[in-house]
Amino acid sequence: MIVDSSVIIAIFLGEPDAPDLSLRLRRAPVRRMSTASLFEAGIVLDQRVGLEPNEPADELYALLQRAGIELVPFTEDHAQIARVAYRRYGKGRHPAGLNFGDCMSYALAKSLDEPLLFKGTDFSRTDIRVA
């Protein structure tokens, strides 16, 4: 299963759906996340939590480790898939309205033919398998 940044953000911030998302993560035999999605999650959490530029992101990495999430490098092939995803499902082009970060998760899920765990409804309007 591929994990979108929205899931990590929700769990990290203790949002109302965090327990359900955590359970779904634990039940998956394989959990992967793109390094591009990790970067996105880090940016969002830095903004919401208010980390200073020199503060380490240890808590985010600890969460990934506890959840058993394998980080997968974002490749040129992923970039090509993400570009096609944006053309098909991007904001202003399609009701799914995928943004830059969404396309990164989409690309990894598509390239590995794995379902995607995410928060919200955007991906359910695409051809991606839902976890």
Each language-model region and where it sits:
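Short, well-structured N-terminal submotif of metal-dependent ribonuclease cores
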Residues: 1-33, 37, 48-62
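Residues that scaffold the ATP/ADP-binding catalytic core of kinase and kinase-like folds
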Residues: 10-12, 44, 126
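Short loop->beta-strand "edge-of-pocket" segments that line small-molecule binding or catalytic clefts
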Residues: 28-32, 67-72
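Acidic, PIN/NYN-like endoribonuclease modules and their adjacent C-terminal/linker elements
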Residues: 106-131
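Glycine/charged-rich beta-loop-alpha catalytic/anionic-binding loops adjacent to active sites
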Residues: 20-23, 62-66, 86-92
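Active-site neighborhoods of divalent-metal-dependent phosphate/nucleic-acid chemistry enzymes
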Residues: 70-115
